[in-house]
A protein has these predicted regions:
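Catalytic cores of DNA base-excision repair glycosylases
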Residues: 2-215
Length: 216
């Protein structure tokens, strides 16, 4: 199957079966999204959604975060992965937002990756979800699904390479949603271990299914 046709079929299925939501994280503004995404690194969205209500209630603004300490934030997020590091990142992020961005979350990649705890993946999520930009975050799910479906060549061995390869074929208006679609497919269907190929809409043309690699 030609690459363009493969992308067309995959994206057509996602568009017709998935809603327009772009994250399972709960948030009400760009600041809350930034906090939630920083916390979500190597942790489940379900867990993050359990700790953020109290965190957002008591620290609703960058100013509030900047005025507290990592030790205080730790008590709110101690059930997530790497709570000490993330507590420091959040307080540092609050301070930088106040000191350099007027208390507002910036919208460009260059500015976002300057924030403590924010790398390219996190920045792309914020750009796409909070600001509607054509940015595609590549996490482990997106990376795995992209390779298994043959959307990207084997030579794409880094998240950045996968991001660039995907964006060559995904229409600009679907780049943001595609991150979430691929993520959900990897999270619930094309899982790392024992993928559910029997219910996968792409099984008939998935090279991993045909060659049996997806069952390893």
């Amino acid at each position: 199957m030609q690459k363009k046709e493969l992308f067309r079929r995959v994206l057509q299925h996602f568009e017709s079966t998935m809603d327009s939501t772009e994250t399972e994280l709960h948030f009400s503004n760009p600041f809350e999204l930034a906090v939630a995404v920083v916390l979500s690194a190597q942790c489940t969205d379900k867990r993050i959604n359990q700790v953020t209500p109290a965190l957002f209630r008591d620290f609703p603004t960058p100013e509030a975060l900047a005025a507290t300490t990592p030790e205080v934030i730790y008590e709110y997020i101690k059930s997530v992965s790497y709570p000490n590091n993330k507590a420091s990142h959040l307080v540092g992020m609050g301070k930088m937002l106040m000191e350099q961005y007027g208390g507002e979350v910036p919208s460009t990649l260059e500015e976002l990756i300057r924030l403590p705890g924010v790398g390219r993946k996190t920045a792309n999520v914020i750009q796409a979800v909070a600001f509607g930009k054509a940015a595609l975050a590549v996490d482990t799910h997106v990376y795995r699904v992209s390779h298994r479906l043959g959307l990207v060549p084997k030579s794409c061995t880094t998240p950045y390479a996968v991001e660039k390869a995907l964006c060559k074929y995904i229409p600009e208006h679907l780049i943001g949603p595609s991150h979430y679609w691929l993520l959900l497919h990897g999270r619930y269907t094309c899982t790392a271990r024992k993928p559910h190929c029997e219910i996968c809409a792409f099984a008939e043309f998935c090279p991993s299914e045909v060659l049996g690699r997806s069952k390893t």
